[in-house]
Amino acid sequence: MSDNQSWNSSGSEEDPETESGPPVERCGVLSKWTNYIHGWQDRWVVLKNNALSYYKSEDETEYGCRGSICLSKAVITPHDFDECRFDISVNDSVWYLRAQDPDHRQQWIDAIEQHKTESGYGSESSLRRHGSMVSLVSGASGYSATSTSSFKKGHSLREKLAEMETFRDILCRQVDTLQKYFDACADAVSKDELQRDKVVEDDEDDFPTTRSDGDFLHSTNGNKEKLFPHVTPKGINGIDFKGEAITFKATTAGILATLSHCIELMVKREDSWQKRLDKETEKKRRTEEAYKNAMTELKKKSHFGGPDYEEGPNSLINEEEFFDAVEAALDRQDKIEEQSQSEKVRLHWPTSLPSGDAFSSVGTHRFVQKPYSRSSSMSSIDLVSASDDVHRFSSQVEEMVQNHMTYSLQDVGGDANWQLVVEEGEMKVYRREVEENGIVLDPLKATHAVKGVTGHEVCNYFWNVDVRNDWETTIENFHVVETLADNAIIIYQTHKRVWPASQRDVLYLSVIRKIPALTENDPETWIVCNFSVDHDSAPLNNRCVRAKINVAMICQTLVSPPEGNQEISRDNILCKITYVANVNPGGWAPASVLRAVAKREYPKFLKRFTSYVQEKTAGKPILF
């Protein structure tokens, strides 16, 4: 009765839990860390049925979720520094999520914790509902599996065990028979002693008496037989003691032989299992060694996929690992670029610029240039410069161009503290180390001499956005934000991400112009000046770090007179290039990494770009 009462009481206690119902479903937009290329992306997240799923957007829910995790064993960890971020991990799978604000994050965490509590692993009621049946089924199946596997390969041992069972039964019967024999013998001896005592008492007169002459009178033989009768126990005449003893010895010998055989089988089985154990131990050792090696290799590689290992003030990656990861990413990009160039050469892609007179009018910009002839001169070039079309940045453009023409062409000697970092043939790259608030602001200056091209051609290809993707390999995408004049535009471009560094974007004004020669002996000079500006159409965003630039490409054309009355060919022209770059990368990249990347990438850029110009202008009329 008490059991029924306790059962009913426990059932009534569970009723409130049943009536509480399932946890409330939740859905909304969260930022999810996708990968190191795309970073944080907005995703439509749904919390339902103890599972967290995400979709690319709310409109694409009908196409199925992009991913889902069960919350039964999930671990929810709010980030220590980012108040809007929280991480959800299930075994090796980790989701990095960011809410709009800390309150929004806490609401999601509370909802997820509620679903986790009501899941199969977190609720006591769920354990009571599911535990018993699982335990019974698993216990029964486990026992049957063990029994079958234990004796499937042990027929000989099983037969010997059956023999020992038979020997045991025989031995028990023999022991019972011998015990009965010994008990009967003991009873017979006891009865004989009682009977002898009685005979002695009843026949005292039969014992010898003393005569008058001193001699003894002895009793007859019959009295002796009464006093010492022959001991023959009753009821055991049918037992063959000798035969039973022989059989007992044979049975024990059989048991010992069977035990010996069983021990031999077990020793063989033990040897077999020992060999298997040794193999498994060796396999485990090799697996652990391979695992350690794999973990070591993963640590060497850029395996950190989470946001904690990207560039930032609280990055968990050290400077050496940062440099190794950046170098590995740049090597991959170089390999991809080499494959792309090889494919272009194989397919013989057509040039992007037309030949002839149309060459001088690239894109939609007004460069009026007649085909060169001996009668034409440099002064005949009609360029619509920035001074002709006044815009709101005109004064700033004039100042930038004037500064570059004054200071950028100066010699690197003297007190400028320029350091020669790379020298390859005619190309020399100099650097001056400058840091401000921990940010590397090293000015860079490169000089180069390229045969067969003019300064106008080099600057034209450098400025023209229509051919930008043909030679620039670091840009992910770009577009012209505003056209200020025919030779002045504002460009917004996003550079390819080099993990673990953050992605960079640049918003800058790009202008091209010809600098008139002061004297007849001065070389023809063209300049492209790119410097950062602000524009409402390209505001700052959270995905990229906005870099600031002040870059100038200054090109001077030197012409050596041809022999005789021959026309000037590309063999007679030489372009002296001065490339100046002042870049503020922003962010938190280590100084040593930035300097190493600059030392590696700037010479590659200059060689790649000048080779591209030589390739595109080969066989075409000269553009002075």
Swiss-Prot record:
Residues 263-303 form a coiled coil. The modification Phosphotyrosine is found at residue 372. Residues 1-24 are annotated as: Disordered. Residues 23-117 form the PH domain. Residues 1-11 have a biased composition (Polar residues). A motif (FFAT) lies at residues 321-327. Keywords: Coiled coil, Cytoplasm, Disease variant, Endoplasmic reticulum, Golgi apparatus, Intellectual disability, Lipid transport, Lipid-binding, Phosphoprotein, Transport. The keyword Transport applies. It is linked to Neurodevelopmental disorder with hypotonia, speech delay, and dysmorphic facies: An autosomal dominant disorder characterized by mild to profound developmental delay with hypotonia, delayed motor skills, impaired intellectual development, poor or absent speech, and behavioral abnormalities. Some patients are non-verbal and non-ambulatory. Additional features may include early feeding difficulties, poor overall growth, seizures, brain imaging abnormalities, and dysmorphic facial features. This is Ceramide transfer protein. It comes from Homo sapiens (Human). The lineage of its organism: Eukaryota, Metazoa, Chordata, Craniata, Vertebrata.
